Amino acid sequence: MTATVLVFVLAVFVVAGFTKGIIGLGLPTISMGLLAVVLPPTEAAALLILPSLITNVWQMLDGGHLRSVLRRLWPLNLGVCAGTWGGAAFLSGLGGPYGALALGVALMAYALSGLAALKLAVPRAAEVWLGPLAGVVTGAITAATGVFVIPAVPYMQAIGLQKDELVQALGLSFTVSTLALAVTLAGGRAFTWDLAWPSLAALVVAILGMRLGQAVRARLSPQAFRLWFFLGLLALGAYLAARGLV
């Protein structure tokens, strides 16, 4: 990896970490999209694993709701593992541009519905079967694109998690997704020692960006957080859709 590429990679992870610190997600979406400019998809995904894993574990542990979200989200996370491993054959770039386009459009539609105050609601009794289904679909999309967002994020928001619960639940879900993706990449021998130092450097700058973002989030009211959460999803969706059209 040349010095120019490394500087670009580190800048990407600062921005991605900052976004994640504010709204609780966005690191893989932003990183995979921008790193694809200079790196092959499997190499970009391999470089993402360490920063994604550590920042998500940190986010998962940062709060007092871990036990409750673990109890509530185990069906979703079980489905994520099954979907990711089942979709391993698609890792090289699923669905081509149309996969990214469809994912982006779905994300924008969800964000717009949230901004319009259309509240999705999942009955508690339905979580037992809808959680695994949402997890399997999320896992398949993760294997295809390296992005962990759809439909796990709408599902977690629809079961009524509050601001801090939602951010911690996102950390849990993304930790599971990252580990499942890591197993898939290891099976395809995508990890090389050449990526070790760049990955460590990416981790450091991602954490710095995330800390800055968390400081901003701490100052947001629940209403402001909801607004920025959906605006962030809208921007990520537009970015993915634009990527799919190029």
Language-model segments: which ranges?
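Juxtamembrane helix-boundary/capping and inter-helix hinge elements in multi-pass membrane proteins
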Residues: 38-42, 63-70, 157-165, 188-192
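Hydrophobic alpha-helical transmembrane segments in multi-pass integral membrane proteins
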Residues: 44, 86-90, 141-147, 181-184, ...
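Transmembrane helix exit motif
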Residues: 56-67, 88, 102-127, 214-215, ...
